[in-house]
């Protein structure tokens, strides 16, 4: 019973970490990355689909993203979505869109670091909330000795610390990436 609660808590924490990683991938660091545009949703034949489903996204140069669109009808919606969501102006060349990323200003880097810290704190709070819920479930179990509960709570804390550390490490490396001058 206790093991099930701990496994469920750890599984939820892994999901939180994966969500945090996907949020980090969207941070613009001055270096081009396919993750910056591939999940942007566009209106395409009446439904909303990510760019990666209507074209091939690549990074030919460190400050450029290239989108080779498979269907001519998707080019305008992609251009519009990129302008709205990233405030970048893609250059059209036939069925290809080229996005050149301007270098980040020092001010923008500071804003990104603030946003990173906020996102990091939200991820840590999510992990702590999972720990709190699991702790309450463990403490409410009937017919379990105090020692077993104590051992389970210690194990839960170790799991929590591991994932909090992982979030901190991911955040630190992303912050270095943002503040690094190119």
From Swiss-Prot:
Q: Name one GO molecular function term.
A: ribosomal large subunit binding
Q: Name one GO biological process term.
A: translational termination
| Cleaved signal peptide residues | none
User: What Pfam families does this protein's entry cite?
Assistant: RRF
Enumerate the UniProt keywords alphabetically.
Cytoplasm, Protein biosynthesis
Query: Does the UniProt entry include the keyword rRNA-binding?
Result: no
Q: Which domain of life is it from?
A: Bacteria
- Gene Ontology terms, cellular component aspect? cytoplasm
* Compartments (UniProt record): Cytoplasm
UniProt lists the family membership as follows: Belongs to the RRF family.
Q: What does this protein do?
A: Responsible for the release of ribosomes from messenger RNA at the termination of protein biosynthesis. May increase the efficiency of translation by recycling ribosomes from one round of translation to another.
What HAMAP family does UniProt report for this protein, alphabetically? RRF (MF_00040)
Q: What is this protein called?
A: Ribosome-recycling factor
Q: Which organism is it from?
A: Hydrogenobaculum sp. (strain Y04AAS1)
Gene, per the UniProt record: frr
């Amino acid at each position: 019973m206790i093991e099930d609660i701990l496994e469920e808590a750890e599984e939820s924490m892994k999901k939180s970490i994966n969500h945090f990683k996907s949020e980090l991938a969207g941070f613009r660091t001055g270096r081009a990355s396919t993750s910056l545009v591939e999940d942007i949703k566009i209106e395409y034949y009446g439904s909303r689909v990510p760019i990666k489903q209507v074209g091939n996204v690549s990074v030919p140069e460190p400050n450029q993203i290239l989108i080779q669109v498979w269907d001519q009808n998707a080019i305008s919606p992609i251009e519009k979505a990129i302008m709205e969501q990233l405030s970048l102006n893609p250059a059209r060349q036939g069925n290809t869109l080229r996005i050149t990323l301007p270098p980040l200003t020092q001010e923008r880097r500071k804003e990104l670091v603030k946003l990173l810290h906020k996102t990091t704190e939200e991820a840590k709070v999510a992990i702590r909330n999972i720990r709190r819920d699991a702790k309450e479930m463990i403490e409410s179990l009937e017919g379990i000795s105090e020692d077993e509960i104590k051992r389970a709570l210690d194990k839960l804390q170790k799991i929590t610390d591991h994932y909090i550390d992982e979030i901190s490490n991911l955040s630190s490396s992303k912050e270095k990436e943002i503040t690094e001058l190119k």
